[in-house]
Each structure stands twice: as structure tokens, then as C-alpha cells.
UniProtKB/Swiss-Prot annotation:
Region (Disordered): 1-94
Protein's recorded name: U3 small nucleolar RNA-associated protein NOL7
Record field: compositional bias (Basic and acidic residues): 75-94
Organism placement in taxonomy: Eukaryota, Metazoa, Chordata, Craniata, Vertebrata
Organism listed in the record: Homo sapiens (Human)
Pfam families per the UniProt record, alphabetical: NUC129
Length: 257
């Protein structure tokens, strides 16, 4: 703090007064310097700093304000109300978005539909067709049938002409079935001769099927045959089974009589 000093008189002062004034000025400068640096100074300047420190200690020692149950309950209710309002706002926003989407969807459907003029034309045309008399409808049906018959006759004529042209162009030959059987028998005899000459008793050759069947027979664990050597075995067994069945049926019928 800066102390105010009394105004000096205009009368000439003594030497002692001048010395006291110099000491006071030096003390005031020291006090100001101490205030700026935050250090206590000597004399009256140190007293206010001590008072400020005591005030800070009192402020630190003060306890926090106590909250009552009613105030805490009011704050909790206020918080719940805020949360409910936010949820309600979110729901309203979602509803508005859905409504907008539905409106846009309806507008797009309307754009895709045909214009009203074309729809009216189609409805009028269908009504006029329904209003026609049954006599006219029968006449139209008869005309269509006649046209179809004429087209069918024309197509039949074209087919007959094609058949005649084919028969005239191509020549057919008659062949007896006996000659065909002789040809088949000759082919079989030729195949048998080739087989005997290649795989006969005087040759050291065997077919693949025979070789595999012999290898399978020599194995300790028998496997399924790759291919049957004689295809007539199954046919003969079937024929024998049929004969046995017939005989058994005849014997049974005789015993019943």
C-alpha cells in the first residue's frame, strides 16, 4: 500500500527533517518493491499481506455446500425429464422420415403409371367390344373358321406336292429279309474265324477279359469280375427258371383238379 504523506510547507526545513523524509521515501520504495515481488516488507507495508493470507486460509477451510434430499430428487427428476424429451424427439423425427419415404414412394408409383388419357382410351375400347351384339360375334367366328380351313387345305396340298416330288426324284429298291440274315451270318462267321486265328489253341495270346479273370481267380481275395466272358450264361439261367416255373404251375393245376 502507498501511504500519503502530508504536503510540505514552503518554509525552509531543517537538516533533520530532510533526513527523515529521505528515510521515509526509501522505506516506501522498499514496501512497493516487496509488494511487486510478493515478499513481506518491513514496517506497516507487511500488515496487509498477513491479512490477505489469513483470508485465504479461511476460504480454504470452508466446507462444501450440503445438498438436501429434496434438491437431489429434483435434479434426478429434471434429468429424467430431459432424457424423455430427447427420446420423444427422436421418435417424432423417425416418424417424419417414414412419412416422407412413403410420400416419395407413392409419387414414384404415380409417375410410372400410364397417363389418364391412355387409360380412358383402353377402358372405352374394352366397353365397345363388350357391347357388340352376339350375331356379329358369331359372324366373326365363322369367318375365322373359314380362313383356318382354307389355310389347312392349302398346307395339305403343299404336303402332297412335296411327297409326290420326293417319290418322283428318289428310287426305292425291294430287299428280301433272307438275304439280310445271310449277310449277318457271314459277318459272324468272319468274326469267329478272325478270333480263332488270333486267339486259337495254337497261339500264345489271350484277350484282356480272360487275362483279368485268370488274375482274379489266382488272387487270395476274390473281387468282382470286370466283364463276363460268356454272356450266354445269364440267358440260359433265365430260360431254365422260366421252364421250371411253367412246369411247377402245370403240376400245381393238376394237383388241384
Amino acid at each position: 500500500m502507498v501511504q500519503l504523506r502530508p504536503r510540505a510547507s514552503r518554509a525552509p526545513a531543517s537538516a533533520e527533517a530532510m533526513v527523515d523524509e529521505g528515510q521515509l521515501a526509501s522505506e516506501e520504495e522498499e514496501a512497493e518493491h516487496g509488494l511487486l515481488l510478493g515478499q513481506p516488507s518491513s514496517g506497516a507495508a507487511a500488515e496487509p499481506l498477513e491479512e490477505d493470507e489469513e483470508g485465504d486460509d479461511e476460504f480454504d477451510d470452508e466446507a462444501p455446500e450440503e445438498l438436501t434430499f429434496a434438491s437431489a430428487q429434483a435434479e434426478a427428476r429434471e434429468e429424467e425429464r430431459r432424457v424423455r424429451e430427447t427420446v420423444r424427439r427422436d421418435k417424432t423425427l423417425l416418424k417424419e422420415k417414414r412419412k416422407r419415404r412413403e410420400e416419395l414412394f407413392i409419387e414414384q408409383k404415380k409417375r410410372k403409371l400410364l397417363p389418364d388419357t391412355i387409360l380412358e382410351k383402353l377402358t372405352t375400347a374394352s366397353q365397345t367390344n363388350i357391347k357388340k351384339s352376339p350375331g356379329k360375334v358369331k359372324e366373326v367366328n365363322l369367318q375365322k373358321k373359314n380362313e383356318d380351313c382354307e389355310k389347312g387345305n392349302d398346307s395339305k396340298k403343299v404336303k402332297v406336292q412335296k411327297v409326290q416330288s420326293v417319290s418322283q426324284n428318289k428310287s426305292y429298291l425291294a430287299v428280301r429279309l433272307k438275304d439280310q440274315d445271310l449277310r449277318d451270318s457271314r459277318q459272324q462267321a468272319a468274326q469267329a474265324f478272325i478270333h480263332n486265328s488270333l486267339y486259337g489253341p495254337g497261339t500264345n495270346r489271350t484277350t484282356v477279359n480272360k487275362f483279368l479273370s485268370l488274375a482274379n481267380k489266382r488272387l487270395p481275395v476274390k473281387r468282382a469280375a470286370v466283364q463276363f466272358l460268356n454272356n450266354a450264361w445269364g440267358i440260359q439261367k433265365k430260360q431254365n427258371a422260366k421252364r421250371f416255373k411253367r412246369r411247377w404251375m402245370v403240376r400245381k393245376m393238376k394237383t388241384k383238379k
